[in-house]
Amino acid sequence: KLVCNHTGSNMLDGVAAAFVLAAKNNGKLDADYASIEIDEASTVRVFPHFKPDYMVLTNLFRDQLDRYGEIDITMKLLDRAMKMAPKMKVIVNGDDALSAYLAMESGNVYVTYGIPGQVFDQKETGEIREGRFCKRCGERLSYDFYHYSQLGSYHCPKCGFARPEADFAAEAIDMTHGLKFEIREKQGRVTPVEVNYQGFYNIYNILAAYSAARTGG
């Protein structure tokens, strides 16, 4: 059985409400797992009350800026939260330099997912992107290609920080009718995926869910 804040309430009150609603009349919780979406700033308020076994870190985009002002603020909040749960395993989108840096520097055990091959002909663009500079040394990152926003194949020419090899990689992508691709795990297992969803971003969503399920056993 699963506890989930499916209504989308992802701050402290909403997370608490999800557990309350899942409890029986006697107050006991009859559940095997909890899959909870938590607002970035709320992680530091939620984690003192329970320590997750796993955290999925998808990306750090500009949609957080209207609430927190700067990506750096969001990163500091997430870093504080991860330090509150040192035994928590992080499942991170390695195609995002900001998220990957957070996971690498956290001290937590982490696994990565991503799309290693170039899908679109997008090597340069005027689009505003976060994470143009290496968080480790400040040098401008060099990209072999972009998928969208700052997601892509990056490396730092100065300190060597680079996109990690994906533990779970989406390959053989076909978006002609819905989404069709393969998920290749580092140890060799290949799982075919075919869904009616549209949108390249949904490949990342499916990868994140698959990676979390496989990592959690």
PLM segments and residue spans:
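Phosphate-binding loop of NTP-binding sites
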Residues: 1-116, 122-133
